[in-house]
Structures are given as C-alpha cells and as structure tokens.
C-alpha cells in the first residue's frame, strides 16, 4: 500500500480508488477462479451520550459558622459551607494587607467564587454588606482554614525550652506522652502530652519536625512536607480534630496499643461540650469482683420463697437469664380423717402470707437503685423498659404475689383500726307522703 501510494501521483486516495475499481471488476465475473474478498460492512460509530449536565447548587439559605473565634455568615453550596470573604477580611484578617492575602492565596492555590444575585441580596438585607456592594466573594470553609493558618498562627515553644537555644529544641517526653499523627493537608507527626491539655486552646502537641507546640485544632492544619496545594480539599473543619488525630502506627504491641488508645480517648473526651466525640465502650468493662457481686444480687432477688430457687439459663453470650421455676414437688399427704379442712385452709393462708412478705422484702431490698422509680426523679423510658423486661423473667410466684384477695385473709390478719374508714351512720328519713287536697 505504501509503495503503490508513493509511486502514484494521487497519493493514497488514488490508490484506494484504483483498488476499489479492481475489486469491482472481479465481482463482475472476469476472473472467477480467484476468490472474492468480501469485507464486512463498516459499522457506524456508536452515538456517544452527551455530557451529564447538572444544575449548579444555588442555595440561598444563610447560616453562620465560627472561624478563629469570629462569627461568619455563609451559604451551604454543594454540601460545604462557603464563607463571606469580605467579612473574613474585615474581622479575622483585618491586620493583613490585600497584597499579603493574595500572595498566600496564590501560593496555596485558593480560588474564591462569586456569589449569586440572590445570595448578594440576602447579605445586603442582613446588613453584612453595604447596599452599594457590586459583588461578593465566597471562600470554602476548608480554604478559609488553610488561609488563616498560614497568616495567623505559628507554633509556640515548649514550656521547658529556652528561646535562646531554639535550634536545639528537645521533645517533651513525659510518663503519659505518646506519638500521634494526622493525614490532613500533607500529614504530620507529633508528640501528644496529655498533662499540658488544660484548656481547649492549650498547646499540647509537639511537631516532630519543627519541635513547636500546637493546640489540637491547629495541629491538624499544620504540615511541613507535602502541602497538597494542587489537591481539591472538601469538608474539612478544625472543630472535628478528634476524628483527625490518630495514634501513631509505631506502636505494634497489643497491650501498649490498647493502653495508649485509651489515653487518647480520654484526652479527646475532655472539653467536649457538644458531645461530638463518643467512643465505643467495651462490652464488659466491669471488674470480675463487681460482676460476681451483681450476679449474687440477681440470684438473691430471684430466690423462690416457697422453698426453691429460680433456674438461670446461660445464654451463648455468657449472660444468665432466669427461666420458669421448676414445678414444686408435691408432698404426699395421707388422706386421713383426722386432718380437718379448716386446718388445711389456715396452713395455706399462713404459707401465702409468708411468701408474700418474704417476696416483697426481698424485691425491695435487692432491686438495683437505678431500676427503682423515684418520686423525685422524672420518669425514664429506659428504666421502665428494664423493669418490664425483668418482670417477665421473675418466677410466677413472685409475680402473682401482689394479686390476692383480701377476703381470704380476714380470719388470719387483724384489722388495722387506724386505717379503717370511718363508719358512716345511717340516717333514716321518713319518706315523703303525698297530701290529698
């Protein structure tokens, strides 16, 4: 093909036309001995779907967020907060010139978008911008954190370090200090000193690179090696530093890792006023002595006053659940004529009274204080649910002891005169008589 096209004055197009003409002559039957080459028809290219167009999020719902202790108005666009840039420049970054701010934005590759007409109108109505403002820039919360961290904050020296010898800063190694790291904006490793975490803004994490101290919410923005300036960051909030700071992977021992992880969780739980961090409690955190005491109390509460104890079935998870009590053995009673039905009835009544008193005393004395409803504490659905579940497992004799007939104990129990209702005197009045006029 290449040789023929080069020798032809028409180039490849002329050769293709001549080759097609020769194939046409062969199809007409001039040379039937040679096989005819049938090419499959060329399929047209598939129709490519058009680009997926999605309308941009033009949310006009204004909300507020906290940036470096200042309240900034923002709009939630695309799932992330976009802050009012003029408000940041006039409050948080008021000590910096526009030239300094622009240079940092260029270095960190921070892009600021423009708000829509509706968003601009809302900011004007709320008094955040003057009515003469032609436009307003919006910056994401993530980029605002990066910008403020680059301009505002630097680390502090360790408490036992002399500033004159700042080139030789040593690590603040204590009995409880351990290594941590984060993976935000290029990663950074540090040494956490729990003893120094005395307030939410206390510098308690020492960077292993520059040896300066940072608060937890500033350490997660701090980085040295790769700043990830060409990475699109989304959804960062320094207030969520409890989720960003992790235990160092240098600790491989199981016991050491568990101990340091518990120290890190205790540190994260401090000053958590909004209860954002909730660690998973272990399944059995009670000591064996406390568990044994609780099991004994539970067995005592389920004691059958009639003479037998409740049966506890062990579940697959190791817990013991009471089951129905075994059927009491019937004593053989000789049907003799000397035993009168009146004495039998009295014995039944006395046994019922003993079972009633013992069950009530034991149920009052053995019920856990948190399971008992108090008149000075509001009702809790969890407590009532636990009591309801516990009552379903109690033996039938204890459950049914509160339901009895007072009439059956009239002969065995002396009446309480002090609590008896006052006797009402019957007033007999003569019925009115009809008078006939």
Swiss-Prot record:
GO CC terms = transcription regulator complex
Biological process annotations from GO: negative regulation of BMP signaling pathway; negative regulation of transcription by RNA polymerase II; negative regulation of transforming growth factor beta receptor signaling pathway
The answer to whether UniProt assigns keyword Iron to this entry is: no
One Pfam family in the UniProt entry: c-SKI_SMAD_bind
A molecular function (GO) term = DNA-binding transcription factor activity, RNA polymerase II-specific
Q: What PANTHER family would the database entry show?
A: SKI ONCOGENE, SKI ONCOGENE-RELATED
Annotated protein name in UniProt: Transforming protein Ski
Which source organism? Avian erythroblastosis virus (strain Sloan-Kettering)
């Amino acid at each position: 093909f290449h040789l023929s096209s080069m020798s032809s004055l028409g180039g490849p197009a002329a050769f293709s036309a001549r080759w097609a003409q020769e194939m046409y002559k062969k199809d007409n039957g001039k040379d039937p001995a040679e096989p005819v080459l049938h090419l499959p028809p060329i399929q047209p290219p598939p129709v490519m779907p058009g680009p997926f167009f999605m309308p941009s999020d033009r949310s006009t719902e204004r909300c507020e967020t906290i940036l470096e202790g200042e309240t900034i108005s923002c709009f939630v666009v695309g799932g992330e907060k976009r802050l009012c840039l003029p408000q940041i420049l006039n409050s948080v970054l008021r000590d910096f010139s526009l030239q300094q701010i622009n240079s940092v934005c260029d270095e960190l590759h921070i892009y600021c978008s423009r708000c829509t007409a509706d968003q601009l109108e809302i900011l004007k109505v709320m008094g955040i911008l003057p009515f003469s403002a032609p436009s307003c820039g919006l910056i994401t919360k993530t980029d605002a954190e990066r910008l403020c961290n680059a301009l505002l904050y630097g680390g502090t020296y360790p408490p036992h370090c002399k500033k004159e010898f700042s080139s030789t800063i040593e690590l603040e190694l204590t009995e409880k200090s351990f290594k941590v790291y984060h993976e935000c904006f290029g990663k950074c490793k540090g040494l956490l000193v729990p003893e120094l975490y005395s307030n939410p803004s206390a510098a308690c994490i020492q960077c292993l690179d520059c040896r300066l101290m940072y608060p937890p919410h500033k350490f997660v923005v701090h980085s040295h090696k790769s700043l990830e300036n060409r990475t699109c960051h989304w959804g960062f909030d320094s207030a969520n530093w409890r989720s960003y700071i992790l235990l160092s992977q240098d600790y491989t021992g199981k016991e050491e890792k568990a101990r340091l992880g518990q120290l890190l969780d205790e540190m994260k739980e401090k000053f958590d006023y909004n209860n954002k961090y909730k660690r998973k409690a272990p399944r059995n955190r009670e000591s064996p002595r406390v568990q044994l005491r609780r099991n004994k109390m539970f067995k005592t509460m389920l004691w059958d006053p009639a003479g037998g104890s409740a049966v506890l079935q062990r579940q697959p998870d190791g817990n013991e659940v009471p089951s129905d009590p075994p059927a009491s053995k019937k004593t053989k009673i000789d049907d003799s004529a000397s035993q009168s039905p009146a004495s039998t009835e009295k014995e039944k009544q006395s046994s019922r009274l003993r079972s009633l008193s013992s069950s009530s005393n034991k149920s009052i004395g053995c019920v856990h204080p948190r399971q008992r409803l108090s008149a000075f504490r509001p009702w809790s659905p969890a407590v009532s649910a636990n009591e309801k579940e516990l009552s379903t497992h109690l033996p039938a004799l204890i459950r049914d002891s509160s339901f009895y007939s007072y009439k059956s104990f009239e002969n065995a129990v002396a009446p309480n005169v002090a609590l008896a209702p006052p006797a009402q005197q019957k007033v007999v009045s003569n019925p009115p008589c009809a008078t006939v006029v």
